Amino acid sequence: MPRFPDQLLYIGGRYVPARGGHTFEVVNPATGEVLANVHNADADDLDAAVDSAKAGQRHWAALTVVERSRILLRAVALLRERNDALAELETLNTGKPLSETRSVDIVTGADVLEYYAGVAQALQGVQVPLREGSFFYTRHEPLGVVGAIGAWNYPIQIALWKAAPALAAGNAMIFKPSEVTPLTALKLAEIFTEAGLPDGVFNVLPGDGASVGHALTEHPEIEKISFTGGTATGRKVMASASSSSLKDVTMELGGKSPLIVCADADLDLAADIAMMANFYSSGQVCTNGTRVFVPRALRTAFEARLLARVQRIHIGDPLDERTTFGPMVSAAHMQRVLEHIEQGKAEGARLLFGGERLRDGALAQGCYVAPTIFSDCTDVMTIVREEIFGPVLSLLTYDDEDEAITRANATSYGLAAGVVTPDLSRAHRLIHRLEAGICWINTWGESPAPMPVGGYKQSGVGRENGLATLQAYTRTKSVQVELERYASVF
């Protein structure tokens, strides 16, 4: 018997059953418990959502910016009021520790919504004189109905990252959460409605890619797609979106990000950063710094610091507030991570810690993989080249800065990068040479609302967050005004 009742689709400000009658199970990855049967949307449901979104968007766009912002700020207040309940639901669905979901997931999502409610007035055009008696001006108009596809690792945060700029700019959104973790997106839809968002402006269609995701990307009445997920899937989404109606796309994709520890770095600080860059959220973070470059002479000392820290990780029930490391999000993902670990062993990486599924006591019921550290890694190893999206740190040594930069950039990815050094001149010099969209100096992982987030190369197209993202959910109209009598050449 599932813990929760059947979860329906959210269309037009209310819950409705899927027209096809199909459902799928959502499972707690820490225990194997079935949490709910979720209705699986299809193309017919999408058509209904688009019709609802078009009607709602006309009303939403007709409101003043201030009126829209007031509604969004009411949603912010509701999110913060229900932080603990939403965090517990997120923990049940994702397996992330409650200590994490309470302090990060809903909090940072609400921060982004608050940010866009505040900066929506910044959507201002320009007025440019052309000559005496003639000028032009520009205005930013909403795109209309936009689609978004979320990832399973930060379900409600990603939903808010995508919805906030879209709604602030006057659009309606159809959001497809990951079929692995769809529960909190539905709660977000309830909150938007309670806050006063017009019916149809935020719809949630749970389901898999084949049933509804592909239909969403190619629907001719959807003007933009924002996608977060793997690079391979991102290519398919982009191809489908462009072939159907030349949709604009934003893609936040995979990464294999480098963290460079400089020769003058405080090794304790560097080890703390490397731990957070690899084992936070059990390693299931797209920006993780999984390729850790350390000077050859410092390898042994750095290994010792990592080993001391990794043994302090508290692995256990995600609902226990002492837990700092939970399971993989699903059995299928756990198996993929374990296969990469075995490949690392087979290709000659030296296993320092972990490298196995955890089966002690209650952990055996869940999808737990030990935090894993490999040393003596080389650039050609699969664990160094491919995104694992799990708790696997690859330690590499280098001899000089030029070598470190060259090797750090020798990847098809370019999502994030970091440098640890007390020498800020060196830090900026290295960061400016690294081919990555998000960079950190002496820290890792924070993505505040005003800071654009996105990748270079195969790690993405466009940006999330920041002022430019608000503009990306609009189209620019140019209007020339002639004050004098128009002179025809005919």
UniProtKB/Swiss-Prot annotation:
Q: Which InterPro entries match?
A: Ald_DH/histidinol_DH (IPR016161), Ald_DH_C (IPR016163), Ald_DH_CS_CYS (IPR016160), Ald_DH_CS_GLU (IPR029510), Ald_DH_N (IPR016162), Aldehyde_DH_dom (IPR015590), BADH (IPR011264)
The record's keywords, sorted A to Z, are: Metal-binding, NAD, NADP, Oxidation, Oxidoreductase, Potassium
Task: Provide the cofactor list for this protein.
Answer: K(+)
Q: Which Pfam families match?
A: Aldedh
Q: In which pathway does it act?
A: Amine and polyamine biosynthesis; betaine biosynthesis via choline pathway; betaine from betaine aldehyde: step 1/1
Q: Which residues bind NAD(+)?
A: 150-152, 176-179, 230-233, 254, 286, 387
- Provide the residue positions that the database annotates as binding K(+) 1: 93, 180
Give residue numbers for the modification (Cysteine sulfenic acid (-SOH)). Answer: 286
Instruction: Kindly state the subunit structure of this protein.
Output: Dimer of dimers.
Per the record, the similarity remark reads: Belongs to the aldehyde dehydrogenase family.
Q: What is this protein called?
A: Betaine aldehyde dehydrogenase
Q: Which organism is it from?
A: Xanthomonas campestris pv. campestris (strain ATCC 33913 / DSM 3586 / NCPPB 528 / LMG 568 / P 25)
